């Protein structure tokens, strides 16, 4: 799968933009704060419906405008396809595929698989569990439509159950209705746990080999799924925690409290690893993500690299560039020295200056 062109209208600092992309490496270079990351964000939003920054739709609309438009012309194999997305300040975003509106965002997932890698991805390793759950969910939602349904339903049930727990202080007679929500929480929660475990097991097998190469054979890595509650124990855990849930007015058991551990040579690197180990693990994770997508959907994803090379030493730069030379990639950077030094093929250059993009070859 490849993206052939991008069009933006009233998106962040872009009034209008049209870019024709190479199937290989597309490098967007220029000074900081010129709008390079905004282009990558637009691509990611159009493929996943979510900003990698966690931005709201209204935040991505150009100042003074009421809506923005993103259009991607893509190709899957020999089949062309167009995605149109309208972001609106006070309404739900509008999405169309080949001119036909879609009602559910989940219908868009997997049409174009994208992997986003930025310096902030180090947070997956070193920050709290919510960062790691978000990583799992964003990738699984692109790969597994059944997971999308299970996750959406689980989150809806969780929201309603927590709302009910807060109301019980005023209406204790509502407690019996918890049984209905508990049944659904367990049903969809089990599906979420099962899918996450399978995903982490597959990812873990791939990342081991990649990380050994990246570390020059010095490190072995394990990615361990750490569910709050095991799948077969979820029903009992929800039942057991009910009284405590009622006291704290929130749901204390379930996959919304899951985590992942990254263990290098027996050490949990989130707590005890050096920044170098954390960077290598983050890089291994993203390269493994690429290979897992290829394995599952039989095609490589589009790779979006946002100012990553400046954060890596020479050895890691070399490994990263060697691992992506066969994938359609969009890379942002301030200069071209790293590519020249690594003799990296630069298929198409774009110079970005204050919301204006000029193609140079």
Regions flagged by a language model, labelled:
Residues 72, 328-335:
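Structural recognition of the conserved hydrophobic beta-strand(s) that form the central parallel beta-sheet
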Residues 35-36:
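Conserved lysine of the Walker
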Residues 306-308:
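Walker B catalytic acidic pair
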Residues 47-125, 129-131, 140-143, 147, ...:
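Nucleotide-state sensing region of NTPase/ATPase domains
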Residues 44:
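Helix-to-loop junction immediately C-terminal to a conserved catalytic motif
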Residues 106-114, 118-183, 187, 359-360:
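A conserved P-loop NTPase coupling/switch region
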Residues 1-31, 172-302, 311, 315, ...:
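Conserved NTPase motor "head" modules and their coupling/switch loops across ABC/AAA+ ATPases, GTPases
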């Amino acid at each position: 799968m490849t993206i052939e062109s991008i069009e933006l209208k009233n998106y962040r600092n872009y009034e209008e933009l049209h870019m024709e992309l190479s199937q290989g490496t597309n490098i967007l270079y220029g000074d900081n704060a010129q709008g390079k990351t905004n282009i990558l964000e637009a691509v990611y939003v159009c493929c996943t419906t979510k900003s990698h920054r966690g931005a709201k739709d209204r935040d991505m609309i150009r100042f003074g405008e009421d809506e923005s438009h993103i259009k991607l012309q893509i190709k899957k194999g020999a089949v062309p396809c167009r995605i149109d997305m309208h972001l609106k300040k006070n309404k739900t975003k509008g999405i169309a595929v080949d001119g036909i509106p879609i009602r559910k965002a989940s219908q868009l997932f997997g049409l174009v698989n994208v992997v986003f890698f930025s310096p902030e991805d180090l947070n997956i390793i070193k920050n709290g569990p919510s960062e790691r759950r978000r990583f799992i969910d964003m990738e699984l939602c692109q790969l597994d439509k059944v997971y999308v349904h299970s996750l959406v339903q689980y989150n809806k049930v969780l929201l309603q159950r927590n709302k009910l727990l807060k109301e019980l202080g005023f209406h204790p007679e509502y407690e019996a209705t918890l049984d209905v929500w508990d049944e659904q929480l367990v049903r969809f929660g089990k599906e979420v746990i099962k899918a996450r475990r399978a995903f982490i097991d597959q990812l873990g097998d791939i990342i081991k080999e990649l990380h050994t190469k990246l570390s020059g054979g010095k490190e072995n890595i394990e990615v361990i799924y750490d569910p709050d509650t095991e799948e077969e124990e979820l029903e009992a855990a929800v039942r057991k925690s009910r009284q405590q849930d009622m006291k704290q007015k929130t749901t204390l058991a379930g996959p919304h409290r899951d985590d992942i551990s990254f263990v290098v040579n027996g050490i949990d690197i989130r707590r005890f690893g050096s920044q170098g180990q954390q960077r290598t693990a983050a890089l291994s994770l993203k390269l493994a993500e690429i290979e897992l997508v290829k394995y599952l959907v039989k095609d490589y994803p589009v790779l979006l690299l946002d100012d990553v090379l400046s954060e890596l030493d020479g050895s890691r730069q070399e490994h990263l560039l060697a691992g992506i030379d066969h994938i359609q990639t969009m890379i942002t950077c301030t200069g071209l020295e790293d590519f020249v030094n690594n003799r990296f093929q630069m298929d198409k250059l774009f110079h970005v200056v204050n919301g204006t993009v000029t193609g140079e070859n």
